[in-house]
């Protein structure tokens, strides 16, 4: 009687590899799998009756690729996603960037919402090439099978900086976040606003952060050691701005009298800190992302990008004339 040892010997592979192929697992190359199946047939081996999970129209699981568990910023997005998904009887599977690729397949899920800036475009495109619906919330990808639901960072940031200029601020410093599309758009708006009003921005006044409060603290420390103290520090997100504000106050500086600070995102704690910021409608962003994905899954949606507006929240960390 022919056994898997015989097949493994003929194919020149391990017994475990043969067992995986015969039981429908796909953790090997197509060439190896086809070779093993051909040898099994040639030797007269009776293949086990297995049930391989195939794509099903009944698959109602959505993958949410989310890795930034250290911040509350994304919680409202997740609430929006879950509220819409559950209203349509879809389940949610939260993945990290390490295992998302495995579950971004119609064997496991019906589609994916990506909120992880560390997830490579190439991985998303690879999944989309297999007619797998994908929504991205942090970037625009030039692919017909990927839809973007993004925030209009530029207009609100530019308006905020221009209002600061009109209120008398002339010396600016900027604290950037990670190298993402959102960060680039916010910085571009900042520079364009200064240029439009004839204000020169010096490289010495540019500080690099990583979205975290600690990087705001570090930037504030460096800024206070500088010989060129700005009138206002514009931060690419709220957590860095909050870190800077706390460090300034710890050092005895008054905010906004000695230095003004503003952020972006309107994090939960920002209103308690009196931080001027740009409010991003994250709940609505998540809700619309889930709605868009379900429509794509069910064949009624469009892959056209969706851009959401944002608005300024003026608070006590800046002295401005808004009328």
Spell out what each predicted region is.
Residues 63, 109-116, 173-176, 206, ...:
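Periplasmic-binding protein-like
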Residues 57-162, 225, 323:
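Alpha-helical recognition/docking segments in bacterial nutrient-uptake
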Residues 46, 90-91, 133, 170, ...:
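Residue-level detector of anion-binding/catalytic polar loops
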Residues 31, 66-76, 96-100, 149-159, ...:
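Hinge/beta->alpha junction and helix N-cap segments in small-molecule ligand-binding domains
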Residues 221-323:
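Flexible loop/turn connectors
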Residues 1-57, 182, 322:
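N-terminal helix-turn-helix DNA-binding module of bacterial transcription factors
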């Amino acid at each position: 009687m022919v056994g898997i040892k015989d097949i493994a010997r003929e194919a020149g592979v391990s017994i475990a590899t043969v067992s995986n192929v015969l039981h429908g697992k796909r953790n090997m190359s197509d060439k190896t799998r086809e070779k093993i199946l051909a040898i099994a047939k040639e030797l007269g081996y009776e293949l086990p009756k297995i049930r391989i999970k195939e794509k099903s129209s009944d698959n109602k699981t959505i993958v949410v690729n989310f890795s930034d568990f250290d911040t509350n910023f994304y919680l409202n997005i997740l609430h929006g996603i879950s509220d819409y998904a559950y209203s349509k009887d879809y389940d949610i599977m939260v993945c990290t960037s390490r295992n998302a690729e495995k579950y971004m397949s119609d064997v496991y899920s019906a589609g994916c919402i990506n909120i992880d800036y560390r997830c490579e475009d190439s991985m998303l495109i690879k999944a989309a090439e297999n007619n797998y619906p994908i929504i991205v919330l942090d970037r625009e990808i030039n692919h017909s099978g990927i839809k973007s639901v993004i925030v209009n960072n530029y207009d609100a940031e530019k308006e905020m900086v221009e209002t600061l200029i009109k209120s008398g601020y002339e010396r600016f410093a900027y604290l950037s976040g990670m190298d993402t599309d959102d960060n680039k758009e916010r910085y571009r708006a900042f520079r364009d606003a200064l240029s439009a009003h004839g204000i020169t921005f010096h490289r010495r006044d540019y500080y690099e952060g990583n979205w975290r409060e600690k990087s705001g603290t570090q930037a504030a420390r460096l800024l206070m050691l500088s010989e060129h103290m700005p009138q206002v520090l514009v931060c690419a997100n709220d957590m860095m701005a909050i870190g800077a504000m706390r460090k300034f106050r710890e050092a005895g500086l008054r905010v906004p009298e000695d230095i003004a600070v503003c952020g972006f995102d309107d994090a939960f704690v920002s209103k308690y800190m009196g931080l001027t910021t740009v409010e991003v409608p994250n709940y609505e962003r998540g809700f619309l992302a889930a709605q868009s994905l379900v429509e794509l899954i069910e064949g009624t949606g469009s892959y056209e990008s969706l851009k959401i507006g944002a608005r300024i929240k003026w608070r006590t960390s800046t002295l401005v004339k808004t009328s």
